[in-house]
Amino acid sequence: MVALLLAGGVAKASALELSMWVMPVTTNAAHDIPALIAPWVAAHPGLTVRVTVLDWESGWNKITAAAASRRGPDLLELGSTWMPAIAAMGGLEPLSAAQLAEVDNGAPYYPQLWKTTQVFGRPGVYGVPWYADVRAAFYRTDVFRQAGVDPARAFADWQSFRDALRRINGITVGGKRVAALAYAGKNDWNVVHNLAPWIWNAGGDVLTADARHSALDTPQALRAIDFYSQLAVEGLVPSNALEKDSDILEGAWVGGDYGVIFSGPWLMRRILEAPAGSVVREHFDVAPYPAGPHGHATFFGGSNLAIFKGSRHKAEAWDLVKYLGGKAPQVRLSLLSSMMPARVDAANDPAWTSRHPVFAKLTAIAADGRAYPPIPAWGPLETVYTKHLGQLAELTAGIGDKYSEPAMRAMVHDTVTEANKVLEEAE
């Protein structure tokens, strides 16, 4: 945890200090976030801002403790799936009608992201979207070219995607054998995010329409889970990949070990920081999720900014939240972090889209972005989903019982049973 004080004009003992908690959205957030808000601070003499950088591993506990005690920052960043829980705890200040009017009632932001500033089935908006995580297929253009695979066809639908993986699997490029696809297995934080788009594109969902029950056992969801699992059963995802987490696999993809990986815009930072002339840096592109029977939606998440309920400086905190929710600061943050802006106009700004062709493609893919229902119980629900669905990796890798559709269905049944208990207890 790192804290840094930023002062506007000449600091005085009587200066009003705002406390701001953020996550490490850039590689040096302790420097970059104060630099991002420096113009706002300069325009507000007598105000100082203390920026504290939390980490994703311990941030949840610190934020929930603050919400429970009403002792915390004036404003803070919240992951989009965290926000409903903290709002439901009474930890966030809802935006007033006047404040909502100042941000045009959310019109500048992607609708799916604006939805995450609310609590499902309840009135009230608790913040503004700050930056976005949109998922896409990152693939090696040199691998596809050597295998004679047309990327446009490869990502057209599920069958063509599987056919393309079969053709690139095991191909040798530049003296290195390349596995077709990387996705993480047991206990990885991306388990649900990786699987959800396949479920949506099959016509299924992670929850029922009223968000009161799990929907993983519908025929559509089961079809998607089976297709996704069969990629590993067939060997298109190496069994050792299923034992690794997303961070390790992303590094291995950048190192040239895999042909395809589904990831988010942060991977661009890793690619662009690779040594000049590296294989992947010179030979990669992105594509949307292969279309299923019901489209090619992708996971859409990110982070929001909110005012802490216990703040004694809510007006000043809102002014800073509103500033950071503006177009220019969001474009600037995207250039610092490689995360996509949460505003539609910022995500289409040439400063972002022309930085690299992939950024423009991510903006286009975001048009099909889809967020989870903003329920307070998402945290414990995701833990259940991650635990059970992560165990599919053991089945597909042949550890213990071998994969079969009945075994998969039994595992999903257990998942749904436990998930429904979590949802029932949360009501």
Which residues are covered by each model-predicted region?
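Long, aromatic- and glycine/proline-rich binding clefts that accommodate carbohydrate-like moieties
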Residues: 109-110, 114, 281-288, 335-387, ...
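Hinge/lid segment of periplasmic solute-binding proteins
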Residues: 80-136, 191, 281-290, 351-355, ...
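Extracytoplasmic/periplasmic substrate-recognition and gating elements
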Residues: 38, 42, 123, 147, ...
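Short, solvent-exposed loop/beta-turn-alpha elements that line the ligand-binding surface or hinge
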Residues: 96-111, 154, 172-173, 179-186, ...
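Extracytoplasmic/periplasmic solute-binding protein
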Residues: 118-130, 135, 159-214, 258
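Extracytoplasmic "Venus flytrap"/periplasmic binding protein-like
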Residues: 35-112, 146-148, 153-156, 251-252, ...
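Glycine-centered hinge/linker elements that transmit conformational signals in sensory
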Residues: 162-167, 210-242, 285, 289
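Conserved C-terminal helix/tail region of periplasmic/extracytoplasmic solute-binding proteins
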Residues: 145, 151, 367-427
